[in-house]
Amino acid sequence: MFNKIPMTLRGFNKLKSELKKLKYITRPCIVKAIANARQLGDLKENAEYHSAREEQSFCENRICEIENKLLRAQIIDITKIPFKGIVIFGSTVTVLQISTSNIFVYTIVGDDEANYKEFSISIHSPMSRALIGKKKNDIIKVNTPTGYIKYIIKKIEYI
């Protein structure tokens, strides 16, 4: 049974772009590197050859992984979901940490799209689990290694 993988259209397109790069740029370069390394002689002690083969293995595995994810992708367009006013997958949520008054803005995305530097958090993260289904001005508690942290939901956007 194939489990669907929730992702945004942006995440789906990002994976498609990576797949295209791997297939049409990276893979041909690796094939050339293997051919060049073969010309250097004995393959048993040819570091360039073994390095290129290892890179080829990584590339082929990543291609298979991406193709599988794209096949199982369930693209969720939150602009077409009538759940306005509550936090759902794909929402961009502004929260205020009660103890510090720091403001954070997070977008809830699929596992493959999560990027903490871009404040995109996985649907399976503790923060997302605390946010899903909540409304503006709700107080949430997020379990962290140092204890619970309380936040107030200040804004919910569906971008």
From Swiss-Prot:
GO MF, any single term? RNA polymerase binding
The name of this protein is: Transcription elongation factor GreA
GO BP terms:
DNA-templated transcription elongation; regulation of DNA-templated transcription elongation
- Which cysteines pair up through disulfides? They are none
**Per its UniProt record, what SUPFAM superfamilies does this chain match?**
FKBP-like, GreA transcript cleavage protein, N-terminal domain
User: Mind listing the UniProt keywords for this protein, alphabetically?
Assistant: DNA-binding, Transcription, Transcription regulation
Q: Which residues form a coiled coil?
A: none
Q: Which Pfam families match?
A: GreA_GreB (PF01272), GreA_GreB_N (PF03449)
Function noted in UniProt: Necessary for efficient RNA polymerase transcription elongation past template-encoded arresting sites. The arresting sites in DNA have the property of trapping a certain fraction of elongating RNA polymerases that pass through, resulting in locked ternary complexes. Cleavage of the nascent transcript by cleavage factors such as GreA or GreB allows the resumption of elongation from the new 3'terminus. GreA releases sequences of 2 to 3 nucleotides.
Q: Which family does it belong to?
A: Belongs to the GreA/GreB family.
Q: Which domain of life is it from?
A: Bacteria
InterPro entries per UniProt: GreA/GreB_C_sf, TF_GreA/GreB_CS, Tscrpt_elong_fac_GreA, Tscrpt_elong_fac_GreA/B, Tscrpt_elong_fac_GreA/B_C, Tscrpt_elong_fac_GreA/B_fam, Tscrpt_elong_fac_GreA/B_N, Tscrpt_elong_fac_GreA/B_N_sf
